Amino acid sequence: MSRMALVIAFVPALIGPASAQKAEIEAANAKWTEFYNKGDFAGMASLYTDDAIALPNGSAMVQGRAAIEAMWKGILAEHVGDPKLTTLDVKPLGPSAAREIGTFSLKTKGPRSQEVSGKYVVVWEKVGNNWKLATDIWNDGN
C-alpha cells in the first residue's frame, strides 16, 4: 500500500476520536458552568478526579476534590460570576486523557462589575464513561 493510501486510511480514524473528545469535553465544560451558575459547588467538584490539582492564578496550589470544592465555594464564587468558557483546542493524549486549551471570561460582583478574561489549560482523564478534570490551571490576561 502506498504512503498516500495509508494517510487516507488513517487520518479519518485519528480525527474522529479527537472531535469526539472535544465534543465530550465541551459538554463537561457546559455542565461545570451550569453548576457554577447554580452555586452547586459539590456538582462542580464532582467533575474533578479525586486527586485533581488546581493551580489558580496568583494563589497556592489546591489538591484533591474536597479542597477544590472549598476553593470554588469560598474564594472565587463570592467575587466573580457568569463564567464563559471557550475551548480553543483539544489534543488527545491517548484514549483516556486529553489536553484542553481555552479562554474564559467572568464578571466581578459588586457595584462596579467588570469583565475579567484569561486563558486556561486542563488535563482531562476519562473515568468510566465521564471526562474529569485532573489538572486545572488558569490565569488572567490575554
Regions found by a protein language model. Give the residues of each.
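Bacterial N-terminal signal peptides
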Residues: A5-L14
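Sec/Tat signal peptide C-region and signal peptidase I cleavage site
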Residues: G16-A20
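A solvent-exposed, acidic/Ser-Thr-rich amphipathic alpha-helical stretch
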Residues: K22-A28, D40-S96, S105, K109, ...
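Amphipathic alpha-helical repeat scaffolds
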Residues: A30-T33
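A short, structured loop/turn motif at beta-sheet edges
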Residues: V90-A98, E125-N130
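Short beta-strand edge/turn micro-motifs at domain boundaries
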Residues: S117-G141
